[in-house]
């Protein structure tokens, strides 16, 4: 059986794609898996590192507003569909799985023309344009949140890797803090804006470095490719670690090291933090169609997280809120338990079984 997984751009698409790929391999070791992406996405790094072949097609950005870029979409789409047909000729998949993003629309169009079974997985509460289109003719549609408005949607959850879903944070804490060069005993704040980073978030938190250090709070800060994390001069003289990295490959250890995370509210960030029982301050991206705030809302309503609007995340807010929160072990434990109770940890295998059911039926014909 052969499977083509189409998705990429950011970790929001690549992480569930790779989690599904790994689950397929566990359930059906002989399955042949190929990933489909574009030359500009994170998939060019993480897919080969995970050991899966990667095919590339031109990206087809879908503008949210009318303009010159919208006029270019038909031409870009035709070129990308042609490239996808060439990939389908080489791979000959029995089933295609799409995760949204710039690569998915041409994959959906070409797959439909070939009559290949299609599975669509939507990561956010508010579906993107490509997945809204693909869901109209997909054989199966899976969603990460129970109230996502897609036709014939099945709630399976967001696929995450077992290294995350099965993480025992307390058991791995000492190892994790040593891995990142952190003190083994200090309260620890994790800061991440996702694979793309979040410059304003980075600046607001890093400017509080001295005040956080004065209260004994150490920080692990993944600033992303756009940077912006610049701990104030003198913060290092306190002896309290403030570790800045561009990207964290071992998010399992980052979660294990942390007592609290400040992050955006992409589906991946929300699901992973909740799954490991890590209390979170969610700062939704202030653009798009509001999907990030909606992603975080179930965790917030359950008491597992705090919502702070991007404009309200100031250095003063960080200084006034974070130290007393990370010092309140009872509140953190309650938040973590509330978040963890919401998340299905077997979504990777749930989605993989849907894919296998369709693909094995197709290959038998």
UniProtKB/Swiss-Prot annotation:
Organism: Nocardioides sp. (strain ATCC BAA-499 / JS614)
GO molecular function annotation: UDP-N-acetyl-D-glucosamine:N-acetylmuramoyl-L-alanyl-D-glutamyl-meso-2,6-diaminopimelyl-D-alanyl-D-alanine-diphosphoundecaprenol 4-beta-N-acetylglucosaminlytransferase activity; undecaprenyldiphospho-muramoylpentapeptide beta-N-acetylglucosaminyltransferase activity
Biochemical pathway: Cell wall biogenesis; peptidoglycan biosynthesis
UniProt-listed Enzyme Commission number(s): 2.4.1.227
GO cellular component: plasma membrane
Localization: Cell membrane
Protein keywords: Cell cycle, Cell division, Cell membrane, Cell shape, Cell wall biogenesis/degradation, Glycosyltransferase, Membrane, Peptidoglycan synthesis, Transferase
First-listed, main subcellular location of the protein, grouped into a coarse class: membrane
Function: Cell wall formation. Catalyzes the transfer of a GlcNAc subunit on undecaprenyl-pyrophosphoryl-MurNAc-pentapeptide (lipid intermediate I) to form undecaprenyl-pyrophosphoryl-MurNAc-(pentapeptide)GlcNAc (lipid intermediate II).
Protein name: UDP-N-acetylglucosamine--N-acetylmuramyl-(pentapeptide) pyrophosphoryl-undecaprenol N-acetylglucosamine transferase
A GO biological-process term: carbohydrate metabolic process
Enzyme class: transferase
Catalytic activity: di-trans,octa-cis-undecaprenyl diphospho-N-acetyl-alpha-D-muramoyl-L-alanyl-D-glutamyl-meso-2,6-diaminopimeloyl-D-alanyl-D-alanine + UDP-N-acetyl-alpha-D-glucosamine = di-trans,octa-cis-undecaprenyl diphospho-[N-acetyl-alpha-D-glucosaminyl-(1->4)]-N-acetyl-alpha-D-muramoyl-L-alanyl-D-glutamyl-meso-2,6-diaminopimeloyl-D-alanyl-D-alanine + UDP + H(+)
InterPro entries in the record: GlcNAc_MurG (IPR006009), Glyco_trans_28_C (IPR007235), GlycoTrans_28_N (IPR004276)
